């Protein structure tokens, strides 16, 4: 299996979902966090105020170091200070857009925090910071739309709208991106399961990193990608649909439509665009696009 195939399967597919994935406290038989980390009220381990502040269950001095902790401080990359991403998507809007992510019925309750998202994004200074305000908002909506589809916890009898249930399930982002991020993800894949900062950071790495012949999702949504002759012949035109093709084209694209997966991704995207006050752009689906990685005679290249 190639680097790309491994990254594809490990970074954006929910490989398994647990009924309860909490790590510590009363949610996990009063277990303590490793390395002296704080145990949050929701049963997750970390070092920031989300974990060591109100409701902390044990080891609340946060004595462990840990890899980023999922919280608010730091983050390299120079993506700007508090006036960066938080100007476009303040915490109140994040909470409203992902309003059920902390519902007790969600396996990932309490895991995906706003501070973890903002801190991880600062590691990628071009994310949500390219182009005018409409484009910046469109990229955030596209990222949250695609990742919400991968972590969706909605079911037909659930309260609220289908597109209110993003970031409900865990999404296990292992992979060779650890080499780029200097994280031992192959040896310690549980880092993604236990640290929301790392979970967001690996997803953003996937979003920002091209994997030939695929462009990066960032390049597509910021209109800096120009289709090659092969792309044009395959019907791959700029727009949100190409991002779906990048992520899961072999299953969801080039088969006509509609299909539930495409429509779900588009539904999340439109909902978040509306919340952020931006336009959708064109070419939202990939129904008429051949997947990347198809070679001569229409046979799928061996990855």
From Swiss-Prot:
SUPFAM superfamilies attached to this UniProt entry: Lysozyme-like (SSF53955), Plant lectins/antimicrobial peptides (SSF57016)
Gene3D superfamilies named among the record's database cross-references: 1.10.530.10, Endochitinase, domain 2, Endochitinase-like
Disulphide-bonded residues: 24-39, 33-45, 38-52, 56-60, 253-286
Entry annotation: catalytic residues: 150
Enzyme Commission number, as recorded: 3.2.1.14
UniProt keyword annotations, A-Z: Carbohydrate metabolism, Chitin degradation, Chitin-binding, Disulfide bond, Glycosidase, Hydrolase, Plant defense, Polysaccharide degradation, Signal
SMART domains for this protein: ChtBD1
Gene Ontology MF terms: chitin binding; chitinase activity; endochitinase activity
Record InterPro entries: Chitin-bd_1 (IPR001002), Chitin-binding_1_CS (IPR018371), Endochitinase-like_sf (IPR036861), Glyco_hydro_19 (IPR016283), Glyco_hydro_19_cat (IPR000726), Lysozyme-like_dom_sf (IPR023346)
Upregulation: By wounding.
Location of the Chitin-binding type-1 domain: 22-62
Coiled coil: none
Homology family: Belongs to the glycosyl hydrolase 19 family. Chitinase class I subfamily.
Function: Defense against chitin-containing fungal pathogens.
Entry protein name: Acidic endochitinase WIN6.2B
Organism: Populus trichocarpa
Higher taxonomy: Eukaryota, Viridiplantae, Streptophyta, Embryophyta, Tracheophyta
């Amino acid at each position: 299996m190639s680097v790309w195939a491994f990254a594809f399967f490990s970074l954006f597919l929910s490989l398994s979902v647990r009924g309860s994935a909490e790590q510590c406290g009363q949610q996990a038989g009063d277990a303590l966090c490793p390395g002296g980390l704080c145990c949050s009220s929701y049963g997750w381990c970390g070092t920031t105020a989300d974990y060591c502040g109100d409701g902390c269950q044990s080891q609340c001095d946060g004595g462990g170091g840990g890899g980023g902790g999922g919280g608010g401080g730091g983050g390299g990359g120079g993506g700007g200070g508090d006036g960066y991403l938080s100007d476009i998507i303040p915490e109140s809007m994040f909470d409203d857009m992902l309003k059920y992510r902390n519902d007790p019925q969600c396996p990932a309750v309490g895991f995906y925090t706003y501070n973890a998202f903002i801190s991880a994004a600062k590691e990628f200074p071009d994310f949500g910071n390219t182009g005018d305000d409409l484009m910046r908002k469109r990229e955030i909506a596209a990222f949250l739309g695609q990742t919400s589809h991968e972590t969706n916890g909605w079911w037909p009898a659930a309260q609220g709208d289908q597109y209110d249930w993003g970031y409900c399930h865990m999404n296990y982002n292992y992979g060779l991106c650890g080499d780029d991020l200097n994280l031992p993800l192959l040896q310690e894949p549980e880092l993604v399961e236990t640290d929301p900062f790392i979970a967001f950071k690996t997803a953003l790495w996937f979003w920002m990193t091209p994997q030939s012949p695929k462009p990066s999702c960032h390049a597509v949504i910021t209109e800096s990608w120009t289709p090659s002759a092969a792309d044009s012949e395959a019907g791959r035109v700029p727009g949100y649909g190409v991002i779906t093709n990048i992520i899961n084209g072999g299953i969801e694209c080039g088969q006509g439509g509609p299909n539930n997966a495409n429509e779900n991704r588009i539904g999340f995207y439109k909902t978040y665009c509306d919340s952020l006050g931006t336009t959708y752009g064109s070419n939202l689906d990939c129904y008429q696009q051949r997947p990347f990685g198809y070679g001569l005679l229409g046979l799928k290249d061996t990855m």
